[in-house]
Amino acid sequence: MTGMTSNGRRPLLNRRLTEFGTTIFAEMSALALSTDSINLGQGFPDTDGPEEIREAAVRALRDGRGNQYPPGPGVPELRTAIAAHQKHHYGLSYDPDREVLVTAGATEAIAASLLALVEPGDEVIALEPYYDSYAAGIAMAGGTRVPVTLRPHEGRFRLDLDELRDAVTDNTRLLLLNTPHNPTGTVLSREELGEIAKLAVERDLLVVTDEVYEHLVFDDAEHVPLAGFPGMRERTVTIGSAGKTFSFTGWKVGWITSTPDLVTAVRSAKQFLTYVASGPFQYAVAEALALPDTYFEAFRADLRAKRDLLAAGLTAAGFEVFRPAGTYFVTTDIRPLGESDGFAFCRALPERAGVVAIPNAVFYDHREEGAPFVRFAFCKRTEVLEAAARRLRAAR
């Protein structure tokens, strides 16, 4: 029997992971290739980041820096740069030797944090819809996932703070937050974060915050790290990443910043995952984090223009568009098109329009909540987005 051991007693896959098969990203990317469609599904840029940072990686390779195992916590140059970044942008002070840990991207940072801090029986609250690795990480740690759903209201997806409070029980160990939020593009406000901080202190909760889109906020939105609120530094693990900010997603360089005790705990799990990774790229990312503010401003402006281009094209094609305040994803409602099943819609869209998108329902425990929503990525070249908009309008 497929998937069974030779004696047929139980499936090969650990039962904690039985709900996680091939990801929707693999399925839709394969569809994009087989239909020669424009892939606006998976969130990676179609151009590389700054040339001087690529050259920094080449220089590190040639100089023999990082070609062997780098230090377990990360190379000192990168840890120092991460601490300087947090101080410069947010006024948060971290000791690069004791309060910074470099990881193999944010995905490992999430997994290591959950494996380190969560035990069987612990409840973990996550904002739904959520990045798919959250569910897998909680499952691998043996925790119980408790979703709190963001729902559309007045053009954006909003958090119901009362619902969040009600979700906390005596078994709640940890809040897993993501702001700017993938896939909805919501950026939690200073006021919302203040209430979350009060709740965490009151109920003595740990918090892991995924802030990989920290520099991709638009219009009047503001990214405010939760660790800066009263009582939060000592209970918050903050996750960052180079991939989204510098358009080098393949380098897999992420990090956490937290207290010495929390960093030590996460490192205890991380060292048995990758141990170390991305040696030469760590030196390059250290230089990237030191780029002038003008780099971050220009990057935001470019993505804001692309957001507006794709949002306008989607609106013209008949979608209801939730204009994101952050990230590089646009969530749409397909019901104005006479559709209600995001899975069926996305599987048919490549043949129908030559464009690939992702059904948001894959990011929900409550699949019915996400059924009519579809996500498009706009971290692509302008001409690609223009072509996608034309195809969608023509297929209307």
Locations of regions flagged by a protein language model:
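N-terminal small-domain helix-loop-helix segment of the aminotransferase-like
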Residues: 5-9, 14-105, 112, 160-163, ...
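PLP-dependent enzyme catalytic core of the Aspartate aminotransferase-like
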Residues: 2, 166, 348-357, 362-396
